[in-house]
Amino acid sequence: MALDIYPAIDLKEGKAVRLFKGDMQSATIYGEALEFAKMFEDMGAKWLHIVDLDGAFAGIPQNLKYIEEILRTTHLQIQIGGGIRNEERIRLYMDLGVSRVILGSIAIKNWEFVKTMAHSYPIAVGIDAREGKVAVQGWAKESDICSSVLAEKFAGSEVQAIICTDINRDGALSGINVSFTQDIACRSGIYTIASGGFASSNELEILDENPYISGVIIGKAFYEGKINLKEALALFENKKVKI
């Protein structure tokens, strides 16, 4: 299968921002989130990856009205993460029309809960790691759980996807950590999306040729003009048609 491309919006007070290695103090504001969502749809995107940064730090969703506006205004399928730590909040997003919910911090504390939720809801697990250790609460705290061990917890589960981010590369335009992503994919056996550090269109073919990596999240590379997203989306959509 051809690589799935997920343009990304990190939401902070309704704005599309990008962080450098997960540091909220380094946030660069690019503009209104809704305008970028519409732009991505016009470029041919089918999916949109959204992180509610305010929600990730607060522990509860903080940008609901902006997410609802994007859902109402576009036809994009949205996967959303940030501050979603119980079934009530999962249902809240499902009722809004979100296509997939990302569980991160709760996946470390209670992976059985996550597997139970995956039986009833479209769930992705976010594995965000720094030097192999999983970080939580908006990456503000580091756990003692190894990313590879956490990935193995979801092998054979109904979790739809694992989104793995190398925090030290996120927003740094230094390239996807392919070996880290491949390890997560092999240990979980689940559709795996690479995130953190995507730098240029040259990486797309490398990722596409890797049988273990199914998708990639593109954020700062687009916002900084490092990739022609419209061309990339068209290229891989055509590949899917041919398949």
UniProtKB/Swiss-Prot annotation:
Reactions listed under catalytic activity: 1-(5-phospho-beta-D-ribosyl)-5-[(5-phospho-beta-D-ribosylamino)methylideneamino]imidazole-4-carboxamide = 5-[(5-phospho-1-deoxy-D-ribulos-1-ylimino)methylamino]-1-(5-phospho-beta-D-ribosyl)imidazole-4-carboxamide
Active site: D10, D128
InterPro entries according to UniProt: Aldolase_TIM (IPR013785), His_biosynth (IPR006062), HisA_bact_arch (IPR006063), Isoase_HisA-like (IPR044524), Isoase_HisA-like_bact (IPR023016), RibuloseP-bd_barrel (IPR011060)
Coiled coil regions in record: none
Pathway assignment: Amino-acid biosynthesis; L-histidine biosynthesis; L-histidine from 5-phospho-alpha-D-ribose 1-diphosphate: step 4/9
Uppermost EC category: isomerase
EC numbers: 5.3.1.16
Major location category of this protein: cytoplasm
Keywords from the UniProt entry: Amino-acid biosynthesis, Cytoplasm, Histidine biosynthesis, Isomerase
Domain of life the protein comes from: Bacteria
A biological-process GO annotation: L-tryptophan biosynthetic process
Subcellular locations according to the entry: Cytoplasm
GO cellular component: cytoplasm
Gene Ontology MF annotations: 1-(5-phosphoribosyl)-5-[(5-phosphoribosylamino)methylideneamino]imidazole-4-carboxamide isomerase activity
NCBIfam families: 1-(5-phosphoribosyl)-5-[(5-phosphoribosylamino)methylideneamino]imidazole-4-carboxamide isomerase
Similarity comment: family membership: Belongs to the HisA/HisF family.
Name of the protein: 1-(5-phosphoribosyl)-5-[(5-phosphoribosylamino)methylideneamino] imidazole-4-carboxamide isomerase
